[in-house]
């Protein structure tokens, strides 16, 4: 009974995990295009999927814990060894783990992209406000001064 419930939870998480992966890929494209409206929509949808996946993950862990098993792959293997749906449990669990690993990798890349864009924006603002490094040149070809503030039209 617990094994079938666990299998159902795993199967129920496959579609949301695939949707999350698709959203993360869309987010990557939107980040490159700096499309804020699309990013806001993606964020809202991402959050609901993450909440759902976390809830199901906790339920799966609770089922394994109730049975006195480890709440990881070895616990799932122990349950599968005594279950009529054991091979399905392991195979679907592997599929879900692979999807979630892909989601984590895509999310990491998106995070790095955000950090890069933040650094670029901060550098651009520093240049606009006259705080650029002395190795940069002004319109006359002379080395600009570090703390020289100027109007935006002169930047």
Q: Predicted segment positions?
A:
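Extended, charge-rich alpha-helical scaffolding segments
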Residues: 2-81, 91
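Short terminal interaction segments
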Residues: 78-155
């Amino acid at each position: 009974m617990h094994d079938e419930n666990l299998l159902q939870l795993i199967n129920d998480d496959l579609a949301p995990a695939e949707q999350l992966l698709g959203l993360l890929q869309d987010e990557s494209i939107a980040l490159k295009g700096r499309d804020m409206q699309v990013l806001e929509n993606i964020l809202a949808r991402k959050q609901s999927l993450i909440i759902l996946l976390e809830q199901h993950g906790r339920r799966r862990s609770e089922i394994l814990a109730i049975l006195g098993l480890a709440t990881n792959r070895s616990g799932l293997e122990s349950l599968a060894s005594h279950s009529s749906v054991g091979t399905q449990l392991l195979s679907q669990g592997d599929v879900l783990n692979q999807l979630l690993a892909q989601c984590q990798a895509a999310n990491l890349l998106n995070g790095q992209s955000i950090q890069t864009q933040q650094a670029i924006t901060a550098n651009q603002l520093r240049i606009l406000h006259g705080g650029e490094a002395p190795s940069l040149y002004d319109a006359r070809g002379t080395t600009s001064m570090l703390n020289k503030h100027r109007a935006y039209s002169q930047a």
